Amino acid sequence: GSEMCIRDSLCPTQELVDAYEMADGTTPILGYNADGSPIINSESGYSEEGFTEEADAEGYYPENTFNMFVDREPRFYATVTYSGAYWRGRQIDFRMGAPDGRTGGPDYTTTGYLMRKFLDEDGVDILRGVFVNKTWNYFRLGELYLNYAEALNEASGPVDDVYKYVNLIRKRSGLPGLKAGLSQDEMRQKIRRERQVELALETHRYFDCNRWKISDQVKAVHGMDIGARDNSFFKRTLVEERVFEAPKHYLWPFHQDEVNKNPDIFVQNPGWGGIN
């Protein structure tokens, strides 16, 4: 999963935050233990303890930023608003009871993150009725590159063109190219991660997970502890355990009335018998 929320639009999940690389292209989270805790890459410089004392020289994060969000790749800062990030000249605070946190009403982030991607920080003022129209990208060049790279890797393995088009995406994002000598499966995992972050919040993740047949492996949704009033907010917390039954949920049901019109040739999808 990449996002969930109630009234605050799309809320990125901890799993999406984990997918972003460090600024130097290293992978901070190598996987997860059985209890959902992260397997941290000790060589990445990533930490889930403490706060930075200095702001980023390029302005990606301010001082007193939780170290989880320090020195991440540029796409992270362009996509996710985290507690401590700046928005319209002030530092956001999602802790319980804080100006941007849960205060008793329905307007709060359920994961401790909000979407920044697509938002106009300067031109929108909802309270005054000022809006900015955005053109939705149903298909864009980055997706085309990743589609081609994925298909070519599945057909021929990690040949030169696979590296070329994945690295075009990475270069534009300020990241170094992939290391040479990856196996087909290693490249497959790199492409999947690249799709997760490059196309984040663009309605791809659900369908990607289904066609890769991994939706039954990515059911848990984690975030920060939005019920905390102090720095214990910055603790991984289970937000939701989703239900996904494989193979049933990889297909949607036909309306049973349609199946009943010609049951000899029209067969309901597996697991969905009796759907009306």
At which residue positions do the language-model features occur?
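Acidic/polar-rich alpha-helix caps and helix-coil junctions
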Residues: S2-E3, R7-N276
